[in-house]
Amino acid sequence: MDKVQYYRRKSLPLEMHKICIVQKTRIPSVEERVSAIREAGFNSYCLRSEDVYLDMLTDSGVNAMTNEQLGAMMVGDDSYAGSATYYRLAAKIKEIFNKDYFLPVHQGRACEHMLALAFVQPKPGSIVPMNFQFGTSVGKIKYCGGDYVICLQEDGLNRQSSNPFKGDFDLEKLERVLKEQGDNIAFVRIESGTNLIGGQPIALDNMLAVSELCKKYGVLSILDASLLQDNLYFIKTRETAYSDKSIREIVRTLSDAMDIIYFSARKLGFGRGGAIILNDKKLFEHIKTFVSSFEGFPTFGGMSVKEMEAICVGLDDTMDENIIAQGPQFIEYLCNELEDAGIPVVTPPGGLGCHLDAMKFVPHIARKDYPAGSLAAAIYIA
């Protein structure tokens, strides 16, 4: 993973790509911004895109694509059944993840819907332990009559910490839940990395230990690999046992331990879509019935074949250390610069973005008054 190392100064990350197409933008005046945020009810989510100079909200599905991805989109096979595009993507998934069966869906939350229908709905009141919750995940679980238990390790919610893997499971708590709930467990969900606590990663050894507990208690282990790209970088650079392993080797080790993997290809693969992958043919056939009912024919699942071709290339790109290093390295650089300026941020730097610690930034605003939302509105105006 390449960096520029100065003789007297700290290193700087490099952008390992060329930019071929640019899009013009503009900075609205202060008066325009005040008017826009007032019209939006001081809710940055309600701003119009033309009133925003730098969009730091829209992350997935709008990323730039490589020239190889754009080229691949031109060879998509639109056949309703037996599409060559499906088989190309299935072969790529087999190559990288060593999983025999692949179900395409239109995006990550659709994966969660299919899995909740398959494993939660048949057992009303069932429980899904997880390292941390994500809105769409728990929404689908509850919609299908289940509930969830967070088993995040104690340090996970500390906003300032030196713990390199704040997304780890508390293994003792997980085992306690598995013992107490027994047959009432639908599956264990492992989020890699952990979105809502600042993109914090989970260690590979921790995920392998979770897998062993699942095997011990006869429970399915299901990996949400949507944010796996950043997590792979952190395993490679923070987990010394795997520092000499290639990204492909790390992925294979993790994948072999999991019963089912799903992901939003908007994050993993740089395209608009999603996938559920597994090795158990009986489970595959069970989940496939829901894909056919809710998503589309099992060889495209509501995805455009152009996007499927792009994802095929994008998954290969995810195995490139220089590509997956881009986000974490620049996020770390920004976090360090802000910390040097006395601005409170979530540490250690994670994936997704550099997260300001709003509770420390605006301590005079009570939690019930939405300090983070208030801070976002103020930064927009400033």
Regions found by a protein language model. Give the residues of each.
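Conserved PLP-binding catalytic core of the aspartate aminotransferase-like
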Residues: P344-A382
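Conserved PLP-enzyme active-site core in the AAT-like
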Residues: D2-F42, C46-V52, M56-A64, Q69, ...
